[in-house]
């Protein structure tokens, strides 16, 4: 049996992969690890304490905030602010980016963007949820307050990205641009242990993930692609299997392991799409590309899009290389 490696050991071991290695990024990832453990503990008590359900307020997107959304947001912010690597965060749950103004954070080199609890509306029915994070080097001068430009960087500028999935087991999956690795939380040890090394997605899959309840509102190209997935064509393993949980992290994680495509296109009610470029699409795209897949808005690479606002939305197609290319073909041939 190979020797078990913890997340902390793995981070230190890989520190030399960074051209500007100083230990800062390693410490930042350790902060995320700590916050994930705290949130995981609370999620596991969600049915026993008064932390499920809505709080009666909406976030900047007009979505009802859940108690655990705010709890996770506070815990991740606190963990990141407590060390000197991060000068500010932008969160799906915050209207504006938050600058850390303590003396401790004055010379910080990084900003973090996050969806602190993706799929939180599923908590009450015990469906897996997750945290998504994205890390950039700031572009404003170190020693000054962070600016909007620090957060509005294209995805190809990310130095690290990852997600935590809180499910039957809790996993942290991340990349720093040198492959994708997954760590499973061992509650008996209180630590994450390397369980999925060098994760790669197959070029072809048999799963397509989309909310087909919105079918009538989809672009023609997406409708035709869904029909393509359902056709009986044994020569290329069709029909595909439809699997949709409604939690981005959960659907993405399954497809990453098994091969498949996740689709969240534009609709008549959301012509720009519904998923957020900065908090969801860019970090997931970075992970997918590092695992050998593709992430697209249907016409261009997700990580080439230059953001114009913090809560910008985009259509999102991510997964096995050949499957994403195929849906792009359908969209190109069937422009509404």
UniProtKB/Swiss-Prot annotation:
Binds 2 magnesium ions per subunit. Its EC number is 3.1.3.11. NCBIfam families: PRK09293.1-1, PRK09293.1-3. Pathway: Carbohydrate biosynthesis; gluconeogenesis. The keyword Metal-binding applies. It catalyses: beta-D-fructose 1,6-bisphosphate + H2O = beta-D-fructose 6-phosphate + phosphate. Keywords: Carbohydrate metabolism, Cytoplasm, Hydrolase, Magnesium, Metal-binding. This is Fructose-1,6-bisphosphatase class 1. It holds the Pfam family FBPase. Disulfide bonds: none annotated. One of its GO terms (biological process) is fructose metabolic process.
């Amino acid at each position: 049996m190979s020797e078990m490696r913890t997340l902390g050991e793995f981070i230190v071991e890989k520190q030399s992969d960074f051209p500007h290695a100083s230990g800062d990024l390693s410490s930042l990832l350790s902060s995320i690890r700590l916050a994930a453990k705290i949130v995981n503990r609370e999620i596991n008590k969600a049915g026993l304490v008064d932390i499920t359900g809505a709080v009666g307020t909406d976030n900047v997107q007009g979505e009802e905030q859940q108690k655990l959304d705010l709890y996770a947001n506070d815990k991740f912010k606190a963990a990141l602010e407590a060390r000197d690597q991060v000068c500010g965060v932008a969160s799906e749950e915050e209207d504006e980016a938050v600058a850390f103004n303590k003396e401790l954070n004055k010379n910080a080199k990084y900003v973090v963007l996050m969806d602190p609890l993706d799929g939180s509306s599923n908590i009450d029915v015990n469906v897996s949820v997750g945290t998504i994070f994205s890390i950039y080097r700031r572009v404003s001068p170190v020693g000054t307050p962070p600016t909007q430009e620090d957060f509005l960087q294209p995805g190809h500028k990310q130095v690290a990205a990852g997600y935590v999935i809180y499910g039957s087991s809790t996993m942290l999956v991340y990349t720093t641009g040198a492959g994708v690795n997954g760590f499973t939380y061992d509650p008996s040890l209180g630590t994450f242990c390397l369980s999925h090394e060098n994760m790669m997605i197959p070029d072809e899959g048999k799963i397509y993930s989309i909310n087909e309840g919105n079918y009538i509102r989809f672009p023609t190209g997406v409708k035709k692609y869904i029909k393509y997935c359902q056709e009986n064509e044994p020569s290329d393993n069709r029909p595909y299997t439809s699997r949709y949980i409604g939690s981005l992290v959960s659907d993405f994680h399954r497809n990453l392991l098994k091969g498949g495509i996740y689709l969240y296109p534009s609709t008549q009610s959301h012509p720009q799409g519904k998923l957020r470029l900065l908090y969801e699409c860019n970090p997931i795209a970075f992970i997918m590309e590092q695992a050998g897949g593709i992430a697209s808005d249907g016409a261009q690479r997700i990580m080439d899009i230059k953001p114009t606002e913090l809560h910008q939305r985009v259509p999102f197609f991510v997964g096995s290389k050949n499957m994403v290319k195929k849906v792009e073909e359908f969209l190109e041939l069937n422009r509404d």
